[in-house]
Amino acid sequence: PTPTRSNAAFLGWHTNQGREMVTNGTAMKSSYGHTLVAYWDTTGHSITKTDSYRNNFRDVPSSAWYYDNVAAVYEYGLMNGTESDEFSPNDQVSMAQTVTLAARLRKLYLTGDGTFASSSPWYQSYLDYALSQGILDAAPADMNAKLTRQEFASILANALPDSALLEINNVPDGSIPDVYRSDTGIYRLYRAGILSGYDDQGTFRPNSPITRAEVAAILVRMADPNSRILFDLG
């Protein structure tokens, strides 16, 4: 059954990986003897779908692995097409696009409205918001630069508050094979189930480029806690 709690939204059941992680949770025993934790959003914030996807993009076939993710980010108002009928799933993302996505994600979460005023250059209003909200510490030197997976994840990790990125996975420091312990943003996203890596060891490939299709998958997990991935690297 779906539990209820006063002034909180149910985010889903998760295993507690043998740890005490119930600050925002309610523990119970399942019929199989496992401890489950009900996670709650007690902030009153969430991201909801405000549009309908009707196969808008001709380069997103229904058989593609990213189809559902592209449809979802369009419905959330997080991503649009590169053209009216194209999504360009294999294109890399730039710094300006990444800042825009992070700003839009945070504003949608906090206010329910992801719109920004027009500006020149086009990304300026998003950049100003990202700086004011602590998503970025300083303005990037090159807003047109194409980002690596590490660069993208480090920015997205700051887009939502801690209360929206609860730890559901056991990912000890140093357990991601190709990520430094100091890359706390990436570890934060692994622990929250936003990222999981390419294999059972959690390999991240931080220096590889990141595509719009991959970005869509990450944004869906940021927006919808029930879509996050459970795993254990301990």
Where in this protein do the model-derived segments appear?
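Secondary-structure capping and domain/repeat boundary segments
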Residues: P1-S62, D68-A71, T184
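Feature responds to low-complexity, polar/acidic, surface-exposed segments characteristic
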Residues: T42-W65, N80-Q150, L156-G185, L195-P209, ...
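PEST-like intrinsically disordered low-complexity regions enriched in serine, proline, threonine
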Residues: A72-V73, A130, L189
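Aromatic- and glycine-enriched pocket-lining scaffold segments that form the walls
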Residues: I218
